[in-house]
C-alpha cells in the first residue's frame, strides 16, 4: 500500500476558486515533481487527455523497475498544484477521482483573458499574463447597433479593470485605430496611477490628442517603442515587429518570459508594395519560429475571404486613373485613418493639377498627428480652405470627405441631405467610394447612396474598380503566416465567433494540433509543451469572469446598460410613452368624490384617429373617481397608471411607459359653488366666504406689515379675487365640456352600442386598484385628526407667513464687491500648485487637491474657495501660453518666470 506521505506532490483537496491573487514564489520549480525516485516508487504515471478542454493526470500501479536498470535517469522535480475533475485508469479499469491543475502559482504559467474583441468586431482589449502579473494589450471601443438607441460608444468593463489594477503592470497598444485606442480615456483612470502606456510614435500622437480632449494629462506615463527593439513591460520582454495595415506604425508583439513565448499579431495583412516602403517583416517571423512560439494569437477578420489582398499601390493607380478621366469635380470618401490612401489621393491631385480640399474634422486630426510624427504625405498648410471652394472651378477641385460609413454628422452624409455648409452635390460631380462597408452599416450606407443617386452625381464603387483594399489579411495570407510561425498552440482573435471557428479549422489544417476558441471573459491557461507534466495538451480553462459592457452616450454620460437605461430607451422607442398630469381638487362641502384636471400626452404611439386617446381620458377620470377622498397622491398615480397601461395593451398590444404626475390644488374652488356665487345665490355664500377667508387670511396679515409702496387697495384685492374665481369657473367648465365631448364624439363601431364602448375601459377599473386596508386605516386617521388641528394650523400658518413677510421686508439685496486677487496671493497659489503637480496627474480627485490649496491659503489669512483657486490656475495657464509666443509679454507679465519654472520643468499642466 502506498503511504500517504508519498502523495504530497498533489493537493488533497480540489478548489473551484478562480484567479488567485497569490504571487508566484521566486523559488518555484520549473518542472513537475514525481512522488519519489522512479527506482523507489511502485507507480507509473501516465497522462491522458480528457474529453474536456482541461487535462487530467492519471496513475496506474506497475512493478518497480530493477535497481540496476536505466531507470536511474534524472528524477523529475516535484510541482504542487490544485486540481479537480474525474479521470479513469485504463490499465486497471478503476475509476478514480483525479485532480487538475488550476489557477494561482501552481497553475499554467501563461494566462489569457480577453475583455473584448472576441465574438465581435471592435472593442479589442486583452489581458496577457505570466501567473498573476499581466499586461493589457489594446483598449478599443465598439460602435453601437440599432438596438442601443442614443449610445455613441461601447467599451470594455472598466470596473473589472479597476478591480484588477494591482495585477496590470503595463498597457501596450498595437496601432491607432479607434477599436484599439478609443477606450483609453476611460481605461487609464481605472488603472494604477503609475501604470505605463507603450505605443509607437504615430500611435502615441493619436493617444495624446484623445486624452487631451478628455482632460487627461499623463505625459510621464506615455512611452514610445520602435520595431525590433526590445523593452520590458510587466513580466514580459516585448519585441515589436513590423506588419502592414491600413494605418502607419502598426506592430505585432512578441512576448518573451521564462515560461514561454507569445506572438500577438495585432491587425495585419501582407502588402508586397506598401507606399511607405515598410514591408511585412517575414524575416522576423522566421527568426521567432526558430526560437519557438508557445502561443500565437492572430487576426481573424477576413478568414472567410479567399485569396490574398491587393496592394495599396494598385489602389493608388486606380485613383489616378479615375481622377484623370473625370471632367467635373471629384469627391472621394475613405477611412480618415488611412494615411497611405490620403497620400495616393494627393498624388492623383498633383498629376491632374487639381487643388486638394479636406472636409471633415477626423481627416485633419489624423493628418496633423502624422505631420507631427513625420509620416504625413501632405503638408496640412498646403490644403485649400473649405470656405474657398467656391473660388475655384469644379474641374480644378478634388474634395476629400469623411462619411464612408454614413455617420450622422459626417461631411458626405450631410451633403446627401443637402445640409452641408461646405459644399453642395451636383449632377456633374464624380464620387469615388474608396472604402469598404463595415458589417452592420449596410443599410444606412445604402440609404446615403440612394440620396446621392437621387441628386445625380456619378458614383464609382465596388470591388472591380480596385478603389479599396482591406487592411486585414485574407485566407491565403493567414495560412502563409501560420506555416511560417508553426506555433505550439493557436488562439484566433479579432472577429465574430464564426470567423474564430473558421480560423481555428484553418490552423488545424496547417498541422497545429492544439487550437481553441474562447469568448470574452473566459480565462485560458497555456503551458509550453515541454512542460507536459503540467498540462498534457497545453490548454486549460481557468474559469469565467462575468464582464459588463460600458456605454457612453456623450462626453460625460458613462455607465452600464442599466445605469444608462438602455432597455428602457429601447422599450419607449418600440412601445411609446404616456405622460399623465393630474391636478387634484379635493371635494367641497356638498361633494364626496375627487375631481381633477387631467392632461394626457403621448409619443410614439398609434392613437387610432383619437379613439384610443378618448378611451384613455375616460378611464383616467373613472379611475380617479374610484379613489377615496383621502387617497394619497402616490396611490392615485399608481392606480391611474395601471389602468392606462392595461387599456393600451388590450387596444394595440403595446406596453408603453406610463409616467403619472399628480399635484394637489388646495386653492381650487368647486365648480357648483363658483357658479352659485356668480349667479347671486345666497345659500352658498358662506361656503365661498369661508374659502375666501382661508385663501386671503394669510395675505392680509402679511400685507399689513409690508411697506406702504407695496400695499394694494381694497378694490384691487376684490378685483383680483373675482378674476381668480372666474378663471377657476372657466377652467372647470372647460373640463366638463371636454369630458362630455369625449363621451359624445367617440365613434361607436357598427353593431355595437355606446355601453359596449364604455365597457372597454370600465373593465380595467377593478378592486385591485383600491387602497389596501392599512392604507384606508391611515387615511381615516388623518381625516379624523385634520379638523381638530385646523384652527391651530391656520393660526400657526398665519404667524409663519407674517414672520416670513417681515423678514423679506427687512432683508434687501446688497451689492457684492468683487474681491480681486492680489499679486502676493497669486504667487502663493502658483507655488502651492507646483508642489502638488505629481498628485494632480491622477485624473480623479483633483477638487480635493484644490480644497487643500484653499485650506492652506486660509491658514495664511487668505480666504479663497477651491473653485476660485482652480479658475485662477486655468487663467494663468492661458496667459502663460499666450505670453510664450510674445517676447514683450514675457518681460511685462510679472508671473511668467514663476509659471515657466514650473511648467517647463513638469511638462503638460493638469488643470
Swiss-Prot record:
CDD domains attached to this UniProt entry: GT1, RNaseJ_MBL-fold
Q: Which GO terms describe its biological process?
A: auxin transport; auxin-activated signaling pathway; chloroplast organization; embryo development ending in seed dormancy; longitudinal axis specification; response to light stimulus; rRNA processing
> What is known about the tissue distribution of this protein?
Moslty expressed in inflorescences, seedlings, leaves, flowers and flower buds, and, to a lower extent, in stems, siliques and roots.
Binding site residues for Zn(2+) 2: 179-180, 267, 494
Top-rank taxon, per record: Eukaryota
Cofactors named for this entry:
Zn(2+)
Where is Zn(2+) 1 annotated to bind?
175, 177, 245, 267
Q: What is its EC number?
A: 3.1.-.-
Keywords, comma-separated and alphabetical: Auxin signaling pathway, Chloroplast, Developmental protein, Endonuclease, Exonuclease, Hydrolase, Metal-binding, Nuclease, Plastid, RNA-binding, rRNA processing, Transit peptide, Zinc
Upon gene disruption, the observed phenotype is: Defective embryo arrested at globular stage. Impaired chloroplast development due to a disturbed formation of internal thylakoid membranes during embryogenesis. Aberrant embryo patterning along the apical-basal axis. Disrupted transport and response of auxin in embryos. Silenced plants exhibit chlorosis and slight disruptions in the cleavage of polycistronic rRNA and mRNA precursors.
Any single GO CC term annotated in Swiss-Prot or TrEMBL for this entry: plastid
This protein's transit peptide sits at 1-70
Q: Where is this region: Disordered?
A: 58-90, 695-723, 735-824
What GO molecular function terms would the record report?
5'-3' exonuclease activity; endonuclease activity; metal ion binding; mRNA binding
Q: Where does substrate bind?
A: 336-338, 468-472
Gene3D superfamilies linked to this entry: Homeodomain-like, Metallo-hydrolase/oxidoreductase, Ribonuclease Z/Hydroxyacylglutathione hydrolase-like
Where, per UniProt, does this protein localize?
Answer: Plastid, Chloroplast
Q: Which EC class is the enzyme in?
A: hydrolase
Q: Low complexity composition bias: which ranges? A: 63-74
**Where are the compositionally biased (Basic and acidic residues) regions?**
713-722, 783-795
Q: What is its main location?
A: plastid
Q: Describe, as the record does, how this protein assembles with itself and its partners.
A: Homodimer. May be a subunit of the RNA degradosome.
Q: What does this protein do?
A: Essential protein required during embryogenesis, especially in initiating and maintaining the organization of shoot apical meristems (SAMs), cotyledons, and hypocotyls. Involved in auxin-mediated pathways during embryogenesis. RNase that has both endonuclease and 5'-3' exonuclease activities. Involved in RNA surveillance to prevent overaccumulation of antisense RNA. Probably involved in maturation of rRNA and in some organisms also mRNA maturation and/or decay.
Name assigned to this protein: Ribonuclease J
The organism that produces this protein has a lineage beginning with:
Eukaryota, Viridiplantae, Streptophyta, Embryophyta, Tracheophyta
Gene designation per UniProt: RNJ
Amino acid at each position: 500500500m502506498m503511504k500517504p506521505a508519498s502523495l504530497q506532490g498533489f493537493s488533497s483537496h480540489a478548489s473551484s476558486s478562480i484567479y488567485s491573487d497569490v504571487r508566484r514564489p521566486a523559488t518555484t520549480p520549473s518542472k513537475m515533481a514525481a512522488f519519489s525516485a522512479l527506482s523507489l516508487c511502485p507507480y507509473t504515471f501516465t497522462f491522458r487527455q480528457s474529453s474536456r478542454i482541461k487535462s487530467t493526470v492519471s496513475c496506474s500501479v506497475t512493478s518497480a523497475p530493477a535497481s540496476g536498470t536505466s531507470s536511474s535517469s534524472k528524477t523529475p522535480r516535484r510541482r504542487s498544484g490544485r486540481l479537480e475533475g474525474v479521470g479513469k485508469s485504463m490499465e486497471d479499469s478503476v475509476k478514480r477521482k483525479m485532480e487538475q491543475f488550476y489557477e494561482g502559482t501552481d497553475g499554467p504559467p501563461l494566462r489569457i483573458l480577453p475583455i473584448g474583441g472576441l465574438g465581435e468586431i471592435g472593442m479589442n482589449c486583452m489581458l496577457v499574463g505570466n501567473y498573476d502579473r499581466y499586461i493589457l494589450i489594446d483598449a478599443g471601443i465598439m460602435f453601437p447597433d440599432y438596438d442601443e438607441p442614443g449610445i455613441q460608444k461601447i467599451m470594455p468593463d472598466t470596473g473589472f479593470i479597476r478591480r484588477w489594477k494591482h495585477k496590470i503592470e503595463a498597457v501596450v497598444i498595437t496601432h491607432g485605430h479607434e477599436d484599439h485606442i478609443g477606450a483609453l480615456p476611460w481605461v487609464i483612470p481605472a488603472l494604477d496611477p503609475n501604470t505605463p502606456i507603450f505605443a509607437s510614435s504615430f500611435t502615441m500622437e493619436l493617444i495624446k490628442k484623445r486624452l487631451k480632449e478628455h482632460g487627461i494629462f499623463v505625459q510621464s506615463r506615455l512611452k514610445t517603442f520602435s520595431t525590433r527593439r526590445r523593452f520590458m513591460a510587466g513580466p514580459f520582454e516585448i519585441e515589436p515587429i513590423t506588419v502592414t495595415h491600413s494605418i502607419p506604425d502598426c506592430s505585432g508583439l512578441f512576448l518573451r518570459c521564462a515560461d514561454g513565448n507569445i506572438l500577438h499579431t495585432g491587425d495585419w495583412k501582407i502588402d508586397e508594395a506598401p507606399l511607405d516602403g515598410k514591408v511585412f517583416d517575414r524575416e522576423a517571423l522566421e527568426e521567432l519560429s526558430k526560437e519557438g512560439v508557445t502561443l500565437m494569437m492572430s487576426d481573424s477578420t477576413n478568414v472567410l475571404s479567399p485569396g490574398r489582398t491587393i496592394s495599396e499601390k494598385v489602389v493608388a493607380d486606380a485613383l489616378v486613373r479615375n481622377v484623370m478621366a473625370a471632367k467635373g469635380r471629384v469627391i472621394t470618401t475613405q477611412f480618415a485613418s488611412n494615411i497611405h490612401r490620403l497620400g495616393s489621393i494627393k498624388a492623383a491631385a498633383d498629376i491632374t493639377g487639381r487643388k486638394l480640399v479636406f472636409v471633415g474634422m477626423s481627416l485633419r486630426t489624423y493628418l496633423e498627428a502624422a505631420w507631427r510624427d513625420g509620416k504625413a504625405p501632405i503638408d496640412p498648410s498646403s490644403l485649400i480652405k473649405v470656405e474657398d471652394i467656391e473660388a475655384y472651378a469644379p474641374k480644378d477641385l478634388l474634395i476629400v470627405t469623411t462619411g464612408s460609413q454614413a455617420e450622422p454628422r459626417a461631411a458626405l452624409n450631410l451633403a446627401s441631405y443637402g445640409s452641408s455648409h461646405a459644399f453642395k452635390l451636383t449632377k456633374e460631380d464624380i464620387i469615388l467610394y474608396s472604402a469598404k462597408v463595415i458589417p452592420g452599416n449596410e443599410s444606412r450606407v445604402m440609404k446615403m447612396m440612394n440620396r446621392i443617386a437621387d441628386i445625380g452625381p456619378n458614383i464609382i464603387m465596388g470591388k472591380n474598380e480596385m478603389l479599396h483594399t482591406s487592411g486585414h489579411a485574407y485566407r491565403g495570407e493567414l495560412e502563409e503566416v501560420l506555416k511560417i510561425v508553426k506555433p505550439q498552440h493557436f488562439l484566433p482573435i479579432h472577429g465574430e465567433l464564426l470567423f474564430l471557428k473558421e480560423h481555428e479549422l484553418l490552423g488545424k489544417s496547417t498541422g497545429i494540433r492544439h487550437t481553441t476558441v474562447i469568448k470574452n471573459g473566459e480565462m485560458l491557461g497555456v503551458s509550453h509543451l515541454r512542460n507536459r507534466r503540467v498540462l498534457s495538451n497545453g490548454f486549460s480553462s481557468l474559469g469565467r469572469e462575468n464582464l459588463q459592457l460600458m456605454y457612453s452616450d456623450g462626453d460625460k454620460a458613462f455607465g452600464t446598460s442599466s445605469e444608462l437605461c438602455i432597455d428602457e430607451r429601447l422599450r419607449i422607442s418600440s412601445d411609446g410613452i404616456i405622460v399623465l398630469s393630474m391636478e387634484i381638487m379635493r371635494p367641497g362641502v356638498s361633494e364626496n368624490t375627487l375631481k381633477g384636471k387631467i392632461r394626457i400626452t403621448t409619443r410614439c404611439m398609434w392613437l387610432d384617429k383619437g379613439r384610443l386617446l378618448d378611451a384613455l381620458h375616460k378611464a383616467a377620470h373613472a379611475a380617479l373617481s374610484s379613489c377615496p377622498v383621502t387617497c394619497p397622491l402616490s396611490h392615485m398615480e399608481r392606480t391611474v397608471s395601471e389602468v392606462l397601461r392595461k387599456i393600451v395593451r388590450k387596444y394595440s398590444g403595446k406596453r408603453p411607459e406610463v409616467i403619472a404626475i399628480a399635484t394637489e390644488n388646495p386653492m381650487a374652488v368647486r365648480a357648483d359653488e363658483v357658479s352659485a356665487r356668480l349667479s347671486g345665490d345666497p345659500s352658498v355664500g358662506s361656503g365661498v366666504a369661508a374659502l375666501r377667508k382661508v385663501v386671503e387670511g394669510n395675505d392680509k396679515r402679511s400685507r399689513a406689515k409690508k411697506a406702504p409702496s407695496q400695499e394694494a387697495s381694497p378694490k384691487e384685492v376684490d378685483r383680483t379675487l373675482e378674476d381668480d374665481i372666474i378663471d377657476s369657473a372657466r377652467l372647470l367648465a372647460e373640463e366638463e365640456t371636454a369630458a362630455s365631448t369625449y363621451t359624445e364624439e367617440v365613434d361607436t363601431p357598427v353593431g355595437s352600442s355606446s355601453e359596449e364602448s364604455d365597457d372597454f375601459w370600465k373593465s380595467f377599473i377593478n378592486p385591485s386598484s383600491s387602497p389596501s386596508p392599512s392604507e384606508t386605516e391611515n387615511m381615516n386617521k388623518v381625516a379624523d385628526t385634520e379638523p381638530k388641528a385646523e384652527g391651530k394650523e391656520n393660526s400657526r400658518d398665519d404667524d409663519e407667513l407674517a414672520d416670513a413677510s417681515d423678514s423679506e421686508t427687512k432683508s434687501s439685496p446688497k451689492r457684492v464687491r468683487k474681491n480681486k486677487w492680489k499679486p502676493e496671493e497669486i504667487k502663493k497659489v502658483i507655488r502651492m500648485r507646483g508642489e502638488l503637480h505629481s498628485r494632480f496627474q491622477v485624473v480623479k480627485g483633483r477638487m480635493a487637491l484644490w480644497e487643500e490649496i484653499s485650506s492652506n491659503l486660509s491658514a495664511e489669512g487668505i480666504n479663497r474657495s477651491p473653485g476660485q483657486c482652480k479658475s485662477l490656475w486655468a487663467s494663468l495657464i492661458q496667459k502663460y501660453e499666450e505670453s510664450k509666443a510674445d517676447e514683450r509679454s514675457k518681460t511685462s507679465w510679472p508671473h511668467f518666470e514663476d509659471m515657466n519654472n514650473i511648467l517647463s520643468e513638469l511638462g503638460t499642466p493638469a488643470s
